[in-house]
Amino acid sequence: MSIEVFNESGRGEVNEEELIDVARYALWTLDVHPAAELSIHIVDLETIEDLHVRWMDLPGPTDVMSFPMDELTPGWGRKDAAEPSPAMLGDIMLCPDFAEGQATRAGHSLAHELDLLTVHGVLHLLGFDHVTPEDEQKMFALQNEILANWYDSQEERGVSFAPKPTGAGAFPSAADRDDTQN
């Protein structure tokens, strides 16, 4: 799986290897073809606001945006699945300046917030959405399950990033989040 991170935000504290690992884990969990490609862009408030206005026709900045390229669905590893070809999933745009406020309000680190938003972005690239309350509940439940399992699997996989956060805001429901994620 090819995952590239482009830090265009000027924020040096963003752990690019951690974002790659959590994205790779999410894609693996969802049975995405191992040759799939993904780009993660770390951007500033001005850039994310411009994208948010231009592509979503919504004012102001946001935390994460996803731009899918090839249509791809989870499940390539199933025995009954057709053999897919490698695909370019698309781009995830993360804004640590915006995410930092959300992390503070939720009582956890910026790193955890960016991990959560990375999983959220991956799900959007794979066609998950939160337009209806039912879809929102399913998407956030899956997002939280993947993220919690990623934390739990670190030792087994021989990686060590941050410890699994605890507290009410660590793995939010859809109702706990601002309605600014896209």
Curated annotation (Swiss-Prot):
GO terms for molecular function: metalloendopeptidase activity; RNA endonuclease activity; zinc ion binding. Keywords: Cytoplasm, Endonuclease, Hydrolase, Metal-binding, Nuclease, Ribosome biogenesis, rRNA processing, Zinc. It comes from the Bacteria. Signal peptide: none annotated. Residues 157-182 are annotated as: Disordered. SUPFAM superfamilies: Metalloproteases ('zincins'), catalytic domain (SSF55486). Binds 1 zinc ion. Its cofactor is Zn(2+). It is an enzyme of class 3 (hydrolase). Single strand-specific metallo-endoribonuclease involved in late-stage 70S ribosome quality control and in maturation of the 3' terminus of the 16S rRNA. This is Endoribonuclease YbeY. It comes from Corynebacterium jeikeium (strain K411). The lineage of its organism: Bacteria, Bacillati, Actinomycetota, Actinomycetes, Mycobacteriales.
